[in-house]
Amino acid sequence: MMGSSQHGHMAAIGYDLYCRMLEDTVKLIKGEIEQEPIETTVDIKMDAYIPSSYIEDEIQKIEVYKKIAAIENMDDYTEIKEELEDRYSSIPEAVYNLMDIAYIKSLAKILLIEEIKENQKEIRFKFQKGFKNVNKVYRVLLSKYKDNVVLYFGETPFFAVRINTIKREEMLNFYKELLKELIENSRKK
């Protein structure tokens, strides 16, 4: 049974996401998980949306937004890409950007990055408070980017990569490759 307040929340975010959030909260209370799952925010200066000219029906559009938001790996990405091409024809760049950003979020969660924020000069990756593998990650960054990376070792560590040498159309691929490389190297002993 749900009260009107809970039903309103469920309607706003969708049944599947609501159930997952509820399940995670119960596990956290029972002590089955140590901390709340990280929710990564991505602030990248890029058009990332589903144009009405691509999907006109608002209900279908919301369903596609939910599917894109649920991307957790490359298999999910490929599955959604194929579904969109089958149902709606070729995918506009803004939708590809949206899918890429969702995939970037999934990679960032693995590294416990809670925020990715871009400005005109750099992109900043902020780790969750108390992140433990910071030395491994920073070692990789220094070996590859030397003068183009700034590292901060405080309680909430972050790194910033200067982006003035990266072309705008290559940015999302740069983020994906950087995060995949950091994940791979952080798993090495």
Range-by-range predicted roles:
Residues 1-189:
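Accessory helical-bundle/CTD segments and flexible terminal tails appended to RecA-like ATPase motors
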